[in-house]
Amino acid sequence: MARYKLLLLLAVWVLTGELWPGAEARAAPYGVRLCGREFIRAVIFTCGGSRWRRSDILAHEAMGDTFPDADADGDSLAGELDEAMGSSEWLALTKSPQAFYRGRPSWQGTPGALRGSRDVLAGLSSSCCKWGCSKSEISSLC
């Protein structure tokens, strides 16, 4: 009889949710679960999306002060460019696309050569989606 009461008490305890929230509470301090676009947005936010905007504004302000008379030289440079493109020297320097790409490795490259960083990203994104990850783990991708 005591066995049945113990089993009934255990069943009521599980059904009321006393067992499951405790397991979730232990996993919560690890990090936030991020999947798909949410993971990408978190990486961009963590790696300094606002710094890109700030550096763009600062670069624009610096260029405005550095090149005050660029418009005056623009017409003469455009004329020189037209002359150079019309000359036979320009045509001698150009190559066909086949000759240009012949000496370079193909876009495919050696199999697995550049996949290391992608594998790290894929591993972290899948673990962030399954178990969650902290901000310090996301910042390791920067």
Swiss-Prot record:
Cellular location of this protein?
Answer: Secreted
The UniProt entry's coiled-coil ranges are none
Q: Which cysteines are joined by disulfide bonds?
A: C35-C129, C47-C142, C128-C133
Task: Check the record and name the SUPFAM superfamilies matching this protein.
Answer: Insulin-like (SSF56994)
Give a GO cellular-component term.
extracellular region
What GO molecular function terms would the record report?
G protein-coupled receptor binding; hormone activity
Which residue windows are transmembrane per the record?
A: none
InterPro entries named among the record's database cross-references:
Insulin-like, Insulin-like_neuro_ligands, Insulin-like_sf, Insulin_CS, Insulin_family
Q: What does this protein do?
A: May play a role in neuropeptide signaling processes. Ligand for LGR7, RXFP3 and RXFP4.
User: What is the similarity comment for this entry?
Assistant: Belongs to the insulin family.
Q: How does it assemble?
A: Heterodimer of a B chain and an A chain linked by two disulfide bonds.
Identification of the protein by name: Relaxin-3
Record the organism.
Pan troglodytes (Chimpanzee)
